[in-house]
Every structure is written in C-alpha cells, then in structure tokens.
Amino acid sequence: MSSSSHNDNKIPPEKTTTPPLSSSNEDIYNPADSSNVLSSNQTLVSTNNNNNNNQNNNQNNNQNNDGKDTMDHLSYLSTIDSKRREQSYLKSFYQRFIIEDVVKNFTPAYFVSVMGTGISSSLLYNFPFPAYWLQICGYVMFGLTCTFFIGNIILLIMSCAYYPNRFRDYHVDPSRAVFMGAFSMGYITIVNFIALITKGEHIYFVWTLWWLAVFSAMYTSFLIVYLSFMSKLNESDVEAKLNATLLLPIVAITVVSSSGHSIELDLPHVHQTVLTMIVSFMLWSLSISMAFMVMTLYMGRLIIHKIPPTNLIMTSFLPVGFLGQSSYSIYLFGNNLNKFIPEELLYGKISLCLSGFVSVFLLSFGYFMCFVAVTSVLSKIRPFAKNPNPSHTNRFGLLKLEKSFWSMTFPMGTMSLSNTEIGHGGVGNYPLLTFKVMGSIFAAACIFITVGCSIGVVVYSFKKLREDMTNKNKYRNESMV
C-alpha cells in the first residue's frame, strides 16, 4: 500500500514541446516566446542606442578634433608670426626698417609730394599779391621740395636694387608706371623755381636743366604710355585701371612746355629763343592731342560707371591740372610772341589774341572739371553721403587724411598760375582783378593743402619710427625675461 501510494504520489515531469513553425497555419501564443521577443527587441533597441551614442561620440570627437586642429593651426600661425617678428627684430635697423618697410612700400606715387611742394614754392615766391614774407616762405618750401625729391630718388634707386622686378613694374604696370610722370613734373617744378630766383642769370645752366626735363617728359609720355597701355607686355585688365591717373605722363610734357616759355626770352641768342619756343609749342600741341583722347575715354567712363570709389576720388582733380597747365602754357606762348615780334608787325598781337582765346577756353573747361571734382569729393562725406565708406572716413563722416590728398595740390596750383597770368592783362594791357583774386584763392588752397599733407608725412614718419622702436624694446625686454 505504502509503496503504491508512494509511487502514485510521484508526478512525472512534463514534457514541453515547441510546435514546429510549419505545423499549422494558426499562430500559437506562448509566453516564453513573447518574453524572448521582448528581450530580443530590447537587445536591438539597446544596440541601436549604443550605435547612436557611438555615432554621437564619434561626431563629438571629430568636432573636438576639428576644433583642436583649428586651434593647432592658429597656434602654428601665431608661432610662425612671432618667429618672424623675432627674426625681424634680430635684424639691424637698416635692414628691418629702411629696407623691409620703407623701401619695400615705396611707389613712384611718392613723387606727387615733390609736385605739390614744388608748385607751392613758386606760388609763394610769385604770389598774385606779393609780399616779402611770402618769398621767404617760398624758399622754405623749396628746401622741403628738394628734400622730398632727393629722398624719393634714393628710395627709387634702392627699390630697383633690392627688388629687381620693380624696374619692369615701373614701366609696364599701369597702376605704377603712370606715376613716373610725377617724377618728371616734380623735377620740372624745381627747374622753374631756380629760373625764378636766378632772374635770367646763369641762363645756360637753367636751359640745360630744362633740356633734361624735356627728355624726362618725353620718356614718360612716349615709352611708359606705350609699354603700360599699348604693348602686349602688360597682361592685366587695363580697362579696370583706366582712370584719370593716365593723364600724369601726358601732363608732364605740358608742364615742361610752360617751363620753356618762361625762360625762352632770357636766352641771349635769337636762334636759341626760337628753338625753345618751337619745341615748347610742339610739346604743348602733343599734350593737347594726347590728353583730349584720354579725357574722352575718362568722360565716357565717368558717365557710364559714375564717379570713382572713395579710394580713387582724389584722382578727379587730375584733369583740372592738365587744363590749368595747358591754359597757362599757351598764354605764355602768345605773350612771348607778342614781345618777340617787332611792334610794327601785327603778327604778335594776332598771336596774343588767339592764344588768349584758347587759354580762356581751356581755363573755362578747367573750372567745370574743378566743380565735378569738388562735388564728387563732397558726395563721399556727410551729410551728402548716407553711408560713407568706413575705411576711408572718420567717425564724423569726413575723409581721413591720406596720401591721395596730394593729388589736389598740383591741379590747384596750375589753376592759380593760369588765372594769375590772365589777370596780368597781357591782352590790351588791361589788368583783370577778378582773375588775380581767383588765382589767389587757388594758390591759397594749394599751399594750405600742401602744408597739411607735409605735416601728415612728418607725423606718419615719426609714428612709424616710434612704433618700430617700441616693438624693438618690447621684444628685448621679453627676451631678457
């Protein structure tokens, strides 16, 4: 009994069999299967989350690596820059400041300062309403002119010596080559002042200097204009650089023409006077023919593309310089013919009248271009400009004092010369006070702008020198620490 009951109480283990997937068409629910599915889904979700986390971590790592690479690159550049500064300050003052700063940044445009101071010295010495103290100021200004001229000549030679490619650029590149005309005109202003103070003495010395001026003017107006704008040596976009600065090499022959007319009557022999007179008139005719071609292109560009940008706005005064100087030259020619030809002949009077008409015609055009230039400058400053260019204007909306201000000096001076000469009343021996007053106004404007620009040059030079010495001392102190 006991054994049987004991055997009956034993429950055999249940055999659980998993039906095959193909046993029937119906789905059979099994809790174990659902738990397995849930666990597998959780596993997939966790796997996806891990993958997403890994991707995010990889992206963060990539971003961190990119940021690190950027920081490393910036630190590398700063290290290179600091090493360059360190190496530069290890050099001598001559190599560091003179060669790598002054000579490296030199351009022939610096000769515009010689033009401005040179014509200002002549205006001070021969002011429309003369005074002795003005003549003394003229001598001082002439000394400044010679200083600028000699300094720029030295920089020009050093620039071509240390940077040989620049000699080609000074003849081919339109943005640089045209300013070689400023070199010629600056030299001619020195010759003019020497002719004023010698008053006919040492005329052969002055005449020799004038022939050198003729050669330099012809060199710039022929060779440089051809190489920079007509030859195939220049592969740059000339149309983009076609502005009023192209007049600079051409105005040089106008200036040397008027210089010849101012000394021709002091020559002792008739054939020398006639030769100088004819050559000077030919130079004036050449400048008129070339300049009016350029003026046509310039006016067309001005009408189509409107006034120049702020950094080139001062070039609007360059046509004024050509018109004023050509007016002055042709009037001197007619006046000299009237004095040279005997009075019993009418040819001198006729030549004076014709030259006077042409001179007034050119002067009137000069007044118009002066109006265009002044209006163009005013349009770049407040209150006429709503949004002045911040890189060229100060916080008051006015133009900053820059090197381009030198472009105003010589044109104002030429307008003064022309007005003053007409005001002397050569035609009919009748002085014209109005033109003398206008000549005084233009002369005062030229002199004041020249003085301001000269002060700016001195201040800028001392500022650069002090900055170099300060950085040198700073580096020396850091290296000692």
From Swiss-Prot:
Pfam families, sorted: SLAC1
Native organism: Candida albicans (strain SC5314 / ATCC MYA-2876)
GO CC aspect terms: plasma membrane
Gene3D superfamilies registered for this protein in UniProt: Voltage-dependent anion channel
Extracellular topological segments: 130-137, 198-204, 266-273, 334-353, 460-481
Keywords: Cell membrane, Membrane, Phosphoprotein, Transmembrane, Transmembrane helix, Transport, Virulence
Function description: Sulfite efflux pump required for the secretion of sulfite as a reducing agent. Plays a role in resistance to neutrophils during infection. Involved in transition to filamentous growth, which is believed to be central to the virulence of this human pathogen.
Top-level division of the source organism's lineage: Eukaryota
Cited InterPro entries: SLAC1/Mae1/Ssu1/TehA (IPR004695), Sulfite_efflux_TDT (IPR051629), Voltage-dep_anion_channel_sf (IPR038665)
GO molecular function: sulfite transmembrane transporter activity
Underlying gene: SSU1
Protein localization: Cell membrane
Induction cue: Up-regulated by cysteine, nitic oxide, and in response to neutrophil phagocytosis. Expression is under the control of GCN2, GCN4 and ZCF2.
Annotated protein name in UniProt: Sulfite efflux pump SSU1
Residues exposed to the Cytoplasmic side: 1-108, 159-176, 226-244, 295-312, 375-438
Any single biological process term in GO: filamentous growth
